Amino acid sequence: MLSSTYGLQHGHAVAITLGKFFEYNMPNSNKLINGKKDKKYIKRTMKNLYKLMGYNNSKKCESYWYKTMQKVGLRFKHLGINKKSNINNLIKGVDANRLKNNPIKLDSDDLRMILDNL
């Protein structure tokens, strides 16, 4: 949706939202898994990702990610998109097939939470 409606390259749109997934993709008992990997595998993978980034938890990785995005000028607020008036369209416009490669399933409520917190 960010790509097609607002003319962003796919990678730009992903970069703007990616920081929120450091926390979201840490499995807990309430989250459903996409694919055949189990929660233990995903948790271990996320912790390894945190270590590769030089941190030990999702919050520090998210903070680092968005500081980096700010330095290079990739911020959601710079897009001129009014989240309050466009959030439903943003959520409806997400390609569900692209979400299948995320290890944790996402629904419209999850997307709303992520977009609200950008």
Short names for language-model regions:
Residues 4-86:
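Gly/Pro-rich interdomain helix-loop hinge
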